[in-house]
């Protein structure tokens, strides 16, 4: 079953990891031709800032899933509910904090670099993209349960379908030469709709998450989350600061140029990650199976992942100059 779930997760991720960049290349080229490089750079920079504001999502996901692996493997619903109820309280508090900090950041963001838009328009664009991420914290609890139970493909296929539909709609907006605000609205709505649908699917598969049992809240999630937040922040500081530095010193136009060229490497990275990260939750289940030879299986997979990544890395190094 672990192999089957890993394969399903990989297949869904791989298809969309290939399809989305194709639409993305078309969309970026058309967006720049119609609205200009500076507006494209503005959008890229806003998304980078929001990535830092949204640091808790991936951190919480990892911390929450780690706690759920064992009770899910043992089918201990009361333990899952106890962890879930404790985590949901933190999610809601964090969602409110992200919305408040996002609003304050939006007011200050136009001062970061010279914007192609007026002050009010820049703040509005930031809020349109930021608010859905804050609201997503009120929806994401059940999503992490289905992911931890190795069935991410059930929600991911819908999330990625919406992402592809988003790209198609954006291309349509550009072809009709509608105002750029529609692009930002589509981007923001996609985040909220994807999380809402994923939540509905997760609750349909785990209706007992809605049970109002008088179980004590488990605070283990809060203890684990603080470590994963630090880990996630270090990753963001390494990989997501380029655009911010370029914008601050060189402006939004150069950010657009840099973002267009880095799009290729980011797309290849997502394809590799789809293969490497798909079995993660299955490994979590495996490590909680006392009868499984988990160490040897993990070692074989790790060696295979390093081998594939090395080959692809060398190929990119050779051809990136010509690109």
For each of these PLM feature ranges, what is it?
Residues 58-74, 147-148, 206-207, 261, ...:
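Helix-loop junctions and terminal segments of transmembrane helices
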Residues 1-6, 180-181, 196-240, 244, ...:
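Interhelical loop/hinge segments that connect adjacent transmembrane helices in multipass membrane
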């Amino acid at each position: 079953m672990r192999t089957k779930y890993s394969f399903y997760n990989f297949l869904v991720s791989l298809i969309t990891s290939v399809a989305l960049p194709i639409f993305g290349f078309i969309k970026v080229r058309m967006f720049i031709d119609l609205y200009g490089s500076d507006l494209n750079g503005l959008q890229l920079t806003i998304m980078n800032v929001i990535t830092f504001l949204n640091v808790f999502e991936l951190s919480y996901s990892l911390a929450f899933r780690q706690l759920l692996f064992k009770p899910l493997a043992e089918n201990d619903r009361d333990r899952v509910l106890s962890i879930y109820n404790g985590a949901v309280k933190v999610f809601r508090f964090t969602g409110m904090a992200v919305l408040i900090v996002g609003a304050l950041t939006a007011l200050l963001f136009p001062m970061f670099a010279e914007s192609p838009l007026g002050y009010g328009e820049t703040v509005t664009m930031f809020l349109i993209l930021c608010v859905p991420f804050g609201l997503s914290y009120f929806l994401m609890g059940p999503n992490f349960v289905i992911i931890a139970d190795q069935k991410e493909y059930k929600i991911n296929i819908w999330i990625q379908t919406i992402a592809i539909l988003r790209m198609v709609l954006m291309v349509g907006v550009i072809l009709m030469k509608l105002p750029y605000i529609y692009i930002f609205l589509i981007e923001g709505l996609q985040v909220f709709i994807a999380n809402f649908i994923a939540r509905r699917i997760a609750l349909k598969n785990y209706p007992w998450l809605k049970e109002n049992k008088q179980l004590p809240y488990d605070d283990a999630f809060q203890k684990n989350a603080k470590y994963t937040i630090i880990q996630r922040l270090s990753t963001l500081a390494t990989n997501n600061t380029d655009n911010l530095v370029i914008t601050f010193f060189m402006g939004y136009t150069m950010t657009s140029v840099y973002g267009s060229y880095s799009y290729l490497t980011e797309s290849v990275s997502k394809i590799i990650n789809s293969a490497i990260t798909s079995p993660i939750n299955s490994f979590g289940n495996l490590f909680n199976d006392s009868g499984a030879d988990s160490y040897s299986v993990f070692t074989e997979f790790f060696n295979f992942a390093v081998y594939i990544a090395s080959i692809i890395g060398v190929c990119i190094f050779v051809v990136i100059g010509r690109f």
